Amino acid sequence: MDALTALWLPVLVSAAAVWFWHFLSWAALSLHGKDWDGLPDEDRFTNALRELNIPPGNYVFPHDDARARSSDPEFKARFKAKWQAGPIGLINVWPAKMSMGGKMIGSFLVNLLVSALIAYLASITLKPGDGFLRVTQVVVTAGILSYSFAQLHTGIWFNAKPRAMIMAVIDGVVSGVLIGVIFAAMWPGG
């Protein structure tokens, strides 16, 4: 079966369903509201960032410049002292008037790509006419793997709260089930 022709509608519908679920989860139901903490003195912190005029980007502190570290013993000593004294952290700096529209479109495009890849996997694993449960089994598994487990590495390495990691996995399971049920309901010959 040609996955892109026979499965284009479930790809689109499942991408939209997952996008809508993530909107509900994050915005409407606020299930992730407790994933983040506020800073004790947010105004002082943000004023300091403004004064430093840090452009949008991803930052780590202390910054380990591998090139300098490999050749400069003084850099090694300074870095080690900073590392031991703390704090250690990551900062994502966004523009002052960030648009959510671009983020929403980007999320939908990722969902579309994931659904298309799952459609490809399903098309080489399943046959037209395979039953609802068999299609669900394969597609839900692929969906959960796609949406849940990559989040765990990010959480481990970037110090996410356990609750945030659990919520990310739950979101991924719901996303996987949505994709699986949609694909099974719209499976060719089913």
Role assignments for model-derived ranges:
Residues 1-190:
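Juxtamembrane/disordered regions of integral membrane proteins
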